[in-house]
């Protein structure tokens, strides 16, 4: 389990202390033709390994202020950032699920952008007490996105705790745009392997 030693620490150790895995991961992030998305445990892993920060500085996630596992439906504001995946969603507010015990961003003084913020700083709307209401970060080059909320759990309207009546004809929620944006970037950059 990736949380036994703390958020993603065991998983991170598998990369840090395995020379072959560490080299493969480092090479992946050095390439200019890659994208990555870390959701929840993936976000924790990216932060623990310093994959969002250009100087590879580790920024471990902290326990939620409530000191318990938080699971619920919240809203996030998608910020203006250089995120390839979120570029068409900038300045929108969308509902999304959270489910984590260590999802608090703190000590956010680094070389990255805040890509998503919880819509309110008050608990339970900011379920973990993250600094600056941060829900997700993106690397300066826009290609690597780390977020605690689960966008994969709100792709279909029926998955959402609330979906606007005026959009009841939607087959997919606006969150699908993150994956469409990624696909378009891959096509625009002629990435085939």
Q: Residues of each region from the PLM?
A:
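Amide-donor transfer/coupling interface in amidating biosynthetic enzymes
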Residues: 22, 26-30, 58-193
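A structural signal for short, well-ordered beta-strand segments and their strand-loop junctions
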Residues: 37-39, 146-147
């Amino acid at each position: 389990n990736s949380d036994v030693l703390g958020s993603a620490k065991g998983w991170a150790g598998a990369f840090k202390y395995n020379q072959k895995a560490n080299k493969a991961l480092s090479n992946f992030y050095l390439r200019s033709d890659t994208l990555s998305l870390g959701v929840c445990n993936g976000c924790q892993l990216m932060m623990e390994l310093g994959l969002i920060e250009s100087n590879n500085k580790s920024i471990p996630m902290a326990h939620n202020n409530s000191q318990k596992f938080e699971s619920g439906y919240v809203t996030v504001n998608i910020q203006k950032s250089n995120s390839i995946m979120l570029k068409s969603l900038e300045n929108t507010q969308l509902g999304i699920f959270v489910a984590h015990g260590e999802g608090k961003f703190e000590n956010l003084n680094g070389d990255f952008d805040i890509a998503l913020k919880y819509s309110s700083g008050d608990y339970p709307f900011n379920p973990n007490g993250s600094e600056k209401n941060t829900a997700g970060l993106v690397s300066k080059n826009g290609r690597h996105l780390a977020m605690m909320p689960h966008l994969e759990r709100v792709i279909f309207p029926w998955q959402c705790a609330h979906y606007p009546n005026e959009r009841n004809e939607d087959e997919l929620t606006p969150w699908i745009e993150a994956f469409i944006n990624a696909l378009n970037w891959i096509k625009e950059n002629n990435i085939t392997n």
